Amino acid sequence: MVSFKAGINLGGWISQYQVFSKEHFDTFITEKDIETIAEAGFDHVRLPFDYPIIESDDNVGEYKEDGLSYIDRCLEWCKKYNLGLVLDMHHAPGYRFQDFKTSTLFEDPNQQKRFVDIWRFLAKRYINEREHIAFELLNEVVEPDSTRWNKLMLECVKAIREIDSTRWLYIGGNNYNSPDELKNLADIDDDYIVYNFHFYNPFFFTHQKAHWSESAMAYNRTVKYPGQYEGIEEFVKNNPKYSFMMELNNLKLNKELLRKDLKPAIEFREKKKCKLYCGEFGVIAIADLESRIKWHEDYISLLEEYDIGGAVWNYKKMDFEIYNEDRKPVSQELVNILARRKT
């Protein structure tokens, strides 16, 4: 049996790719990468995929074997090296987290049907691969509240269950899979559901100077962990639009802060008696390496303490790389921590 405790994300391969090309898809991740991951001690990968890989907007309902072949080969490699695979829809018809303000998925019945039909198709395709592959329905929902996501999620679960009653399904809450939003998910009486959250706290440490975050770029400070944010009062005084950051003044960045921010997920599990999974966590690669190692050490120790599986973001590139282009770890100590190897 495979385990889903110590995982790593394969972002940037068939999701969030820079260019839609056969050359990229054939070379970004190969069997050698999966072998490297397994040899490091990881027990699973999370494979984000974007729907255009397998379905064209011009031919709805016709699924592309050339795109599906990348999922197939990743699954075969994972089976060869005894790894689990979490298949995560990162970009759905009418929705992706980067463009949530222009999303149409939650108001367009045609897009919703496409979303459910894709999962229905994948459930049939991988009906005999229950041990190695789990399904994560949608990455990082961002909605005013959980109402529309709950409705679509329940419809999708029902469709999958008509085909496969024991497939592990991973379901995340609103607001970018926030631990605080798990409590607002619709209740499901199903023994094969795992509740998924993401964890990038404290944000201005894990995303320091992130080029895609207006607030991180504006603050533009090097932040160390453990430590504190510097210059908050002066920054807010000069940038009043970020007045919300005053609550970060004198905040101690340490393991107890991580525990506090993880608490909503733990309380949700205690109340619901369910399984939890952290589908993404990590620290931007431009952060101080020593701080990066210490944050992961503290966070992994909490996941271990609370018996929660998870997958670090990200195997390579995507600004959070754990490995470089030559499959060399940025830090062997960091890899050992992430693979939960006791040294």
UniProtKB/Swiss-Prot annotation:
Q: Which Pfam families match?
A: Cellulase
Which InterPro entries does the entry mention? Glyco_hydro_5 (IPR001547), Glyco_hydro_5_CS (IPR018087), Glycoside_hydrolase_SF (IPR017853), Glycosyl_hydrolase_5 (IPR050386)
- According to its UniProt record, which reaction does this protein catalyse? Endohydrolysis of (1->4)-beta-D-glucosidic linkages in cellulose, lichenin and cereal beta-D-glucans
PTM per Swiss-Prot/TrEMBL: The signal sequence was not cleaved in the protein expressed in E.coli.
Task: Name the domain of life.
Answer: Bacteria
Keyword Hydrolase assigned to the entry: answer is: yes
Q: What is its EC number?
A: 3.2.1.4
Please give one Gene Ontology molecular function term for this protein: cellulase activity
Instruction: Name the keywords, alphabetized.
Output: Carbohydrate metabolism, Cellulose degradation, Glycosidase, Hydrolase, Polysaccharide degradation, Signal
Q: What class of enzyme is it?
A: hydrolase
This chain's function reads: This enzyme catalyzes the endohydrolysis of 1,4-beta-glucosidic linkages in cellulose, lichenin and cereal beta-D-glucans.
- Family statement: Belongs to the glycosyl hydrolase 5 (cellulase A) family.
Q: What is this protein called?
A: Endoglucanase C307
Provenance organism: Clostridium sp. (strain F1)
Q: Its gene?
A: celC307
